[in-house]
A protein has these predicted regions:
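C-terminal motif of bacterial Sec signal peptides marking the signal peptidase cleavage site
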Residues: 26-29
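Bacterial signal peptide processing site
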Residues: 31-34
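Terminal, low-structured helical/coil segments at or just beyond the last alpha-helical repeat
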Residues: 36, 209-262
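Structural marker of alpha-solenoid helical repeat scaffolds
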Residues: 40, 74, 108-109, 142-144, ...
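Canonical tetratricopeptide repeat
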Residues: 50, 84, 118, 153-154, ...
């Protein structure tokens, strides 16, 4: 009797253990399926964001919106999805939705300097320079941001638009300290100097850059303007020839023709 009792006592436990194991396998299977579905949805969202951005670049905003709406359904917690949608709404002129989407992107990726920089660009383009500059500097000081010199240059451009040139000068100089071969920062600094009548430092900056690094169309056209303002026709012609040879058919080459410096 006791033997039967022991056997009866073990059987339920044995069955229970098997049931628990089966349940664990089922749960693991569900978790695996959920993870796979989430990964597939994320990949689909990434693809639709790429398509949406491509359509935006082509000016097809209707198709862009369709792709980005799909991306949002597939991965509503993606900062990249919200950032792309923010750019779309900005293009559509819907500032409220654009701002909300940029904020959503930052909510899902608060420390991502790309998202911070993107929002800063939007803020500056819409006259919110104080907020924009603050965001640019936040991105520039982020240790994982690979191009802080670009953020400092953007901050300077934003400050110039707000007629805060001396603060802009500091940010352009910071950018060049971080990356001396960053042509955009050199152009912006030399252009600021030119606008303030500081012809000698503007010319020195242009010549120093071109003599060490690759020239750009913007720097060469500015070189023409600076040299002409200095009355140095030979230097102006030298810049002009290089612009025509190295960058034919560009907007800068056409602007050169309009200056009558070709």
């Amino acid at each position: 009797m006791s033997k039967h009792s022991n056997s009866a006592g073990r059987a339920p436990g044995h069955v229970q253990l098997i049931s628990s194991a089966v349940a664990a396998l089922l749960l693991a299977g569900c978790a695996g399926n959920s993870a796979q579905k989430a990964e597939k949805a994320h990949e689909a969202a990434v693809y639709n964001v790429q398509l949406g951005v491509a359509y935006m670049n082509q000016g097809d905003l209707e198709r862009a919106k369709d792709k980005l709406d799909r991306a949002l359904q597939q991965d509503p917690n993606s900062a990249d999805v919200h950032s792309a949608r923010a750019q779309l709404f900005a293009r559509l002129g819907n500032k409220d939705k654009a701002d909300a989407e940029y904020r959503a992107a930052l909510r899902f990726a608060p420390n991502d300097p790309r998202m911070i920089n993107n929002y800063a660009v939007y803020l500056c383009q819409n006259g919110r320079s104080e907020e924009g500059v603050k965001r640019f500097l936040e991105a520039a000081r982020n240790p994982i941001y690979p191009t802080p010199e670009a953020a400092y240059t953007n901050a300077g451009v934003c400050l110039r638009a707000a007629k805060r040139d001396e603060e802009a000068r500091v940010d352009f100089q910071r950018a060049l300290q971080l990356r001396p071969n960053f042509a955009e920062a050199q152009f912006q600094l030399a252009n600021l100097q030119f606008d303030h009548g500081e012809l000698a430092p503007a010319r020195a900056g242009i010549d120093g850059f071109i003599g060490t690094y690759n020239a750009t169309a913007d720097l060469l056209l500015l070189g023409v303007r600076v040299a002409r303002a200095q009355g140095d026709r030979i230097a102006a012609q030298r810049y002009a020839r290089k612009l025509q040879l190295d960058f034919p058919g560009t907007d800068q080459a056409r602007a050169l023709a309009a200056l009558g410096a070709g």
